[in-house]
Amino acid sequence: MAQKDNQKEMNDQLKVRREKMQFLKDEGIDPFGSRFERTHLAAALHEEFEAIEKDDLDVKNQEVTIAGRMMSKRGKGKVGFADIRDRSGKIQIYVRKDEVGEDNYKIFKKADLGDHLGITGQIMKTDMGELTVKATHLTFLSKALRPLPDKYHGLTNVEQIYRQRYLDLIANPESMDRFTKRSKIISAVREYLDTHDFTEVETPVLHGQAGGASARPFITHHNALDINLYLRIALELHLKRLIVGGMERVYEIGRVFRNEGIDTKHNPEFTMLETYAAYFDYKDVMDETEGIIRFAAHKVLGTGQISYQGQAIDLDSDFARVHMVDAIKAETGVDFWQPMTVESARELADQHHVKYEEYWQVGHIINAFFEEFVEDTLVQPTFIYGHPVEISPLAKKNAEDDRFTDRWELFMHGNEYANAFTELNDPIDQRERFEAQAKERENGNDEAEGIDEDYVEALEYGMPPTGGLGIGIDRLVMLLTDAASIRDVLLFPTMRPDKQENEEI
C-alpha cells in the first residue's frame, strides 16, 4: 500500500512539473534555456566577499551573475530565498518582487527544486551575516521534470547511488568532492611523472593475445578481419616494446578489463598506471612509487598523514621493505628459505590448512601462505619483495637465489596498491617462462599467460635493464579519499542488470 501511495505521489509531482513547464512555454520562456555567461562561481563569491562587513558590501554595490541548480527554496508572498549550487559550492539568493518585477518573479515562484536558474544581482549580507545575491533579474535555464531525492536525507540507497550517479552527485556533496579529488589525484600522478622525464603514451586496448597479467580476458570479434580480439588485461607488453624502441621512460594511465568477479576491491574495468624506466631496477621503482604516492597525497590533501577506514596511515616516513619469505616466517614460523620439494610444501600447506591446486609448485604455495597469514597484517606502507618465480613470469630472477624474482607488491591496510619488478629482458628465459605458463593453462589455470611470439621477438632486439611499475589508480583514490569500496570511486561501476529493466525488456 505504501509503495502505491509513493508511486501516486511521484506521478502527481511529475504531472505538476510538466504543467509548470507548459506555463513557462505559454509565457514565452524557454524551459530549457541557452548559453548563459556568469561572472562568478559560488566559491569565488565566498572567497572574495566573505570577509567584507555587511555595510561595506552595501556601499560597494557589486553586481554579480551566477548560475546553478536550486537546492532549497523558502519564503512566501512577495519575498523569497533559495540556495543555488554550482560545481564549486553553494550560495544563497534573495528575491523580491519589487526588485525583479512581476513577470520575472513568476519565474521564481514557478521554479522547483532541481531547476537551473541564472541570477544577476548585488552581493550582500543578510542580518544574520549570510553572504547572499540580491536578485535584480532571473533567467530560467533548465526545468527539472523529476523531483530531487529527499533534501533532508540525501540519496542513501546504495544501489541507486551506483546506478544513478548523477543523483548521487546532486544530493551528496561528499560524492562530488570525492570525484573532484580523483581527477586531482590523477593530475598529480601525471605531474610527478612528467617532471621526472617520463613520456605519456597510448597503446592499444584491443589485443591479438591477452598478456601482461594473470587474468581471464574479455573476448570480442572484429568483423572485417574475422578474428577474435581481447580487451587488454594489462598495459605492460606494449609499453616494454617502446622501451626496446628507445623511448627509455614511458607511462600510460588507461582502462584495463578483466573478466572476473566483482567485490569491494574489484571491478571488471578499472584504471591502471604503468610506468617503465630503462636502467632502473626494482629498488629504484620503490623510490619512484613512494614519490608518486607521497606527491599525490600532499598535492590533493596537503598532508602525508592520512586516515583510511579509521586507521592512521603514514605516507611521509620511508615505506618498510620486507622479503616475502621473512614476512611468512615472522607470522607462522614456517621457513621457506629451506630448499624443499613440492611434496614437502604441500605437507606444510596441509598442516596450516592452506588450500592449493594440483598444478601448483612450491612458489605457488609460498604465495598462498603469504596471502593467508601475512597480507591482512600489513597496515603501514610495506613493500613485500622476492616473489617466487612461478607466479612472476615477466620478472627477472634474483641473482642470489633464482627461486625468487626481483619483484615487489606494495601493501597498506591489508590491501595491495602496486606491483613492480625488474623486468625480464632475457628473451630465452622469457620464452621458457611463457612455455611454463602455457603448461599451467593446459593443467587447468585459465588465468595463465600464453606465448606472445611478437613480444619475445622484440626482446631479441635487446631491451635494456628496466624497472616497471603498476599502480591501481582506483585503489589509490580509495586510499586518499577514505572510500570503503571501489564502487565509491568509479562514476559508473559495473552492476548486475536491474530486475525492473529485465522485466520491461
Curated annotation (Swiss-Prot):
Superkingdom in the source lineage: Bacteria
Cofactors demanded by this protein: Mg(2+)
Catalytic activity: tRNA(Lys) + L-lysine + ATP = L-lysyl-tRNA(Lys) + AMP + diphosphate
PANTHER family given in the database record: LYSINE--TRNA LIGASE, CHLOROPLASTIC_MITOCHONDRIAL, LYSYL-TRNA SYNTHETASE
PROSITE patterns: AA_TRNA_LIGASE_II (PS50862)
UniProt-annotated location(s): Cytoplasm
Protein name: Lysine--tRNA ligase
Oligomeric and partner information: Homodimer.
Residues holding Mg(2+) 1: E409, E416
Major subcellular site: cytoplasm
GO MF: ATP binding; catalytic activity, acting on a protein; lysine-tRNA ligase activity; magnesium ion binding; transferase activity; tRNA binding
Organism: Latilactobacillus sakei subsp. sakei (strain 23K) (Lactobacillus sakei subsp. sakei)
Record NCBIfam families: lysS_bact, PRK00484.1
Binding site for Mg(2+) 2: E416
Cofactor annotation comment: Binds 3 Mg(2+) ions per subunit.
A UniProt-annotated Pfam family: tRNA-synt_2
UniProt similarity note: Belongs to the class-II aminoacyl-tRNA synthetase family.
GO cellular component: cytosol
